[in-house]
Amino acid sequence: MKSLFAAALSAAALLALAAPTVGRAATPAAAARPPAAAAAGKTLKPFASEREFRRAMARLLGSNASRRHYAPPVPVAPDAPVAPAAPAQPVPAPLAAAANKGTTLDRIQVTGSRIQSPSAGSPSADTITNVQTQGVDEGDIVKKQGDYLIVLRRGRLFSLDTGGDRLRAVSSIDAFAPGSDPSDTWYDEMLVADGTVVVIGYSYDRGGTEIGLFDLQAGGGLRYRATYQLRSSDYYSARNYASRLIGKTLIFYAPMSLEDYETDRPDARLPALRHWRSGATPADFRRILPATAIYTAPGLLDPHDVALHAVTQCELGGPRMRCRSSAVLGADSRTFYVSEDAVYVWTSRDPDPDHPGRPNAAVFRMPLDGRPPSALRASGSPVDQMSFLQRDGWLNVLVGNDAEGEAMWASRTRTGDLALLRVRLSEFGDGRGIAHRAAYRPLPQANIYDYDLHARFIGDWLVFGFGGYWGDKDGVDVKRAFALRYARREPVSTLRLAHAVERVDALGPDAILIGTDRDDEEQVSTRALHFTSLRLGAAARVAGHHLQTGATQSDDRTHGFFYRPEDADNGLLGLPVIADDGDGGARVLFLRNRRLDLSAAGALASSADAGRRRDDGCVVSCVDWYGDARPIFAGQRVYALLGYELVEGRRDGGRIVERRRLDFTPRAKVSR
């Protein structure tokens, strides 16, 4: 994911999917649809046995036919009727605490369990992450558990005590297993549940996702518990996060390329899990994905563009991690989104030039309660998870006919012509159904091709705009945003701005747009960061504006921003920025929201000598791919996480000023 070659993104020009009446919009041309019974009320079929799966893979991937970029889909039909999937069984209650948390392989459960999510409208007091769906936590670099902030940074975990009036470092520990070699591994994100700290990473050396478990002890100490290694391809996305947490259930998505699948060694390229131990070998891996939990649909697979998309759920309620996994077969290009009760995986391939308008995508719905997945054929692709919303029995997705999904840096390529797809969940079925042409709403006024798309569903609205460019920027005006009620066929509102749109986020029921007025990244001192508030009421309109000169965002991921409402109309927001102070000093900027009137509320900055601090001895995961700064609102206290500094603020005449700071730079090199 962090290899240099991956940054060189392909930008192939794709052909139109649209009917002539709507230009190049992502609306598919009229096509013969299967009977309604073929879609509604049905689900995908799993393979009936390991033998059937292996035979299907041999037919699909074993052909010696010449390789064509636009190969026709190859049906994967069973030789005999497939037995229905076994009904989901609840995962047994967590085992009683075991005295020995040693290195024996934990039992793998391939069964279902209904996830108990926190009640809507009552976010936890420990919530400090700007998540997409309330009650669905997302992996990040800092989490709160009781009095403690847990920070994941440069291959280590740190616990910081903020209880009472304290601000002190308590404990630090390697983010990997003692005695293991972390070389060529990236420890990206973290979650916390009832004293269990979960670190998610990816190892190029071992070829899989790593899940590290640590105990947060009563006094704030950190203790290593276990490491699990899941064979997978790289999950990295410049915008999305690999892991989610609902209650005590860990959910993570991992793709698995089948490009090197060997029909005579099928287990070598399928998801498997091992509990790491000293001296672990490949033989320790155990399949957690039986063929009877792999689903497909006739006609959706291309032998030259196929991957296995796996969703794994693990229960964290006991000393042993219990996991189950299911997967769908689809095209390699993907975007995934987690709602409160399902994981959606959107896969797509290049359009077929011989059949313009033929659906080139499929969206899979994988319920979190253990029921079989379902699917719907579609056209185009979303650019990231923020392009999705499941609500009130509908799925809404903003798609582009040139978009290539979110893998690696694909979200930062052109989107092409845009459309809003809105379909009922009841339309998902056995994979033969096609989204109706009428389900797409073309958005021709928003077709800006060579700029990054940023979008978010907020209340009843979809708000989006365009920021940094990657192609030809001449003559393109990106200083505008678009807003529409996604459930209504009302005109799209075009909002004139003083800046491009590099972030869309929520201010309670309303919106904020953030971006710069220049795209010359070498001229930071002449750039200005704009904040524009939008009122989303009877109509969408610009309500307020704030200008911060000589600054740019230091992190464009969703987690860089946080808004704390004080009541229905007022609140405080924080955003990491890089200021023009001579050496690119980092800080968290705070703004006050008063009925959508935005005003400066101070900043908390890193120390002047932060860039010249002692060597931290980093040996692994030494690039901050997920950023290194966050605004943190914990109760009535306000902090800025800035690298190895935690700066606490206090209110002074309506502004946030520094009260004190904690430097938790490690004093010893990371052990290996």
For the regions a protein language model found, what residue spans apply to each?
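Bacterial N-terminal signal peptides
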Residues: A7-A18
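Amphipathic, positively biased hydrophobic alpha-helical segments used for protein targeting
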Residues: A18-A19, A254
